[in-house]
Design a protein with these regions (language model features):
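Active-site mouth of glycoside hydrolases
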Residues: 1-137
Length: 139
């Protein structure tokens, strides 16, 4: 595929609907790990909530991915594909975010902490985590 000219890019953009979106994390997940781990990914919750988003006029969601999910690439790709299909069924175009250095620096797979009442993003995890970041400093 060749690079688009400026006029081709502008023509494509003019054909797009106005982007109306939000950050999305399903109601059963405390963070981006819990959203996509096989034990906690919930198609029905995603279908219901993305349907609500569509009914409210949203056409895009920003979704954060976590590098630790790639420890089992086939399972992660399967779950992500299921999520993308749910988005498509609801006319939602996701924006997938690969890196996030906010909040808790020591992520791990498995059961995630319970929410802390009154603390914004109490269970959110950095991606990549501090161990990986520090290991790269000495390269």
């Amino acid at each position: 595929m060749a690079k688009w000219s400026e006029s081709e890019a502008l023509a494509w953009y003019k054909e797009q609907d106005w982007i109306v979106g939000c950050n999305y994390l399903p109601s059963n997940a405390i963070n981006q790990l819990e959203m996509f781990q096989p034990e906690t990914f919930d198609s029905e919750i995603n279908k219901r909530e993305l349907s609500w988003a569509n009914n409210l006029g949203f056409n895009s969601v920003r979704v954060y991915l976590h590098d630790l999910l790639w420890n089992d690439p086939e399972t992660f790709k399967d779950i992500l594909d299921r999520f993308l299909n749910i988005c498509d069924q609801n006319n939602i175009r996701p924006i997938l975010v690969l890196f996030d250095d906010c909040h808790r620096p020591f992520p791990k797979l498995g059961i995630q902490p319970k929410p802390v009442t009154g603390v914004h993003n109490s269970g959110w995890k950095q991606s990549p985590g501090m161990a990986i970041v520090l290991s790269l400093i000495h390269i």
